[in-house]
């Protein structure tokens, strides 16, 4: 199961959530991870002793209860209630940290952080952050581009010209997200987000030219940090026999499953004389039309069928 350390969570959100260490620095490597019986959204919540969260957030009501607990009003000790598995405690709303909670976290190597933000907002941000960071992921070989605001993954065997095609599309005003190793994350039940690893960001390898820095050559708008994957275009090598067998009037929708998410796919034969950049743009435009309920192939077949019926009726009504 994917997991991250408390240290990474702190580094990624320190300024956004105004986080500060209060105790438990030795537990900075505690892991926060997805459990089989708990979704990501259940990792964060207000202080709960019955169904403990991995990240326990102390708000106004929880702080008041802890103060009563420390004063002995409840008849319980910290150890009686805190004998639970948790990775991190955050005291929100700019509240002071009770000495009892600080001592308990220090003795048990539980990171204790403070934040000046209100606890509901703090939890919302952390849930979104964890949902993206701990999402199921996969790496696909190909080039990931933003074409007409649609996330397009171009795949195919090595040597078919994926990088050259990407370079042509970038020169036509489209944007590069990732080359070679595309990281895909399932951020929702039916949503895949494509990103590029920090090491490969901005770079595109083109045979004969080497490594190109796309941002430096084409400017800031030629690069996108991430994009939702909506369309896969698979390049295949085509010979005369393949082109003869190609069904040119198919209305069947092809999909490819990635991380149990079905993504629309299109197969483009690579042959001498074909302008692949124009074909990719046309495929994306056609996909956008289909999202609006318009299918050119189906429309042509319906028009063809109507014409056949009219011809048949005219033939029957023709006098002998």
UniProtKB/Swiss-Prot annotation:
Region called Important for the catalytic mechanism of dephosphorylation, residue ranges: 269-274
EC number(s) recorded for this UniProt protein: 2.7.11.-, 2.7.4.-
Top-level taxon: Bacteria
Residues noted as binding Mg(2+) in the record, renumbered to the chain: 163, 205
Alphabetized CDD domains for the sequence: HprK_C
UniProt-listed Pfam families: Hpr_kinase_C (PF07475), Hpr_kinase_N (PF02603)
Binding-site residues, ATP: 156-163
InterPro entries linked to this entry: HPr(Ser)_kin/Pase, Hpr_kin/Pase_C, Hpr_kin/Pase_Hpr_N, P-loop_NTPase, Ser_kin/Pase_Hpr-like_N_sf
UniProt keywords, alphabetically: ATP-binding, Kinase, Magnesium, Metal-binding, Multifunctional enzyme, Nucleotide-binding, Serine/threonine-protein kinase, Transferase
Keyword Transferase in record: yes
Gene Ontology molecular function, alphabetical: ATP binding; magnesium ion binding; phosphorelay sensor kinase activity; protein serine/threonine kinase activity; protein serine/threonine/tyrosine kinase activity
Needed cofactors: Mg(2+)
Subunit note: Homohexamer.
Family: Belongs to the HPrK/P family.
Biological role: Catalyzes the ATP- as well as the pyrophosphate-dependent phosphorylation of a specific serine residue in HPr, a phosphocarrier protein of the phosphoenolpyruvate-dependent sugar phosphotransferase system (PTS). HprK/P also catalyzes the pyrophosphate-producing, inorganic phosphate-dependent dephosphorylation (phosphorolysis) of seryl-phosphorylated HPr (P-Ser-HPr).
Domain notes: The Walker A ATP-binding motif also binds Pi and PPi.
Name this polypeptide is given: HPr kinase/phosphorylase
Organism: Neisseria meningitidis serogroup C (strain 053442)
């Amino acid at each position: 199961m994917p997991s991250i350390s408390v240290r990474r969570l702190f580094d990624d959100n320190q300024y956004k959530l105004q986080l500060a260490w209060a105790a438990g620095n030795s537990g900075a490597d505690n892991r926060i991870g997805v459990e089989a019986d708990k979704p990501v959204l259940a990792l964060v919540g207000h202080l709960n002793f019955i169904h403990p969260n991995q990240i326990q957030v102390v708000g106004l009501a929880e702080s008041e209860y802890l103060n009563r607990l420390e004063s002995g009003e409840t008849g319980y000790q910290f150890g009686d209630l805190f004998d639970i598995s948790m990775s991190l405690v955050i005291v929100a709303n700019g509240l002071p940290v009770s000495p009892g909670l600080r001592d308990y976290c220090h003795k048990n190597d539980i990171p204790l952080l403070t934040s000046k933000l209100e606890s509901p907002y703090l939890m919302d941000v952390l849930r979104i952050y964890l949902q993206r960071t701990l999402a199921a992921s996969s790496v696909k070989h190909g080039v990931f581009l933003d074409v007409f605001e649609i996330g397009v993954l171009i795949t195919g065997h090595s040597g078919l010209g994926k990088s050259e095609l990407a370079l042509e599309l970038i020169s036509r005003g489209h944007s590069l997200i990732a080359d070679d190793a595309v990281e895909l994350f399932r951020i929702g039940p039916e949503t895949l987000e494509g990103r590029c690893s920090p090491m490969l960001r901005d770079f595109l390898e083109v045979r004969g030219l080497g490594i190109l820095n796309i941002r430096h050559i084409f400017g800031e708008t030629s690069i996108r940090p991430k994009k939702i994957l909506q369309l896969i275009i698979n390049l295949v090598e085509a010979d005369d026999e393949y082109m003869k067998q190609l069904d040119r009037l198919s209305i069947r929708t092809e999909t490819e499953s990635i991380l149990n998410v079905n993504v629309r796919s299109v197969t483009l034969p690579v042959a001498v004389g074909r302008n692949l950049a124009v074909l990719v743009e046309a495929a994306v435009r056609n996909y956008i039309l289909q999202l609006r309920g318009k299918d050119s192939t189906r429309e042509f077949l319906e028009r063809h069928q109507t014409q056949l019926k009219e011809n048949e009726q005219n033939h029957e009504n023709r006098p002998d």
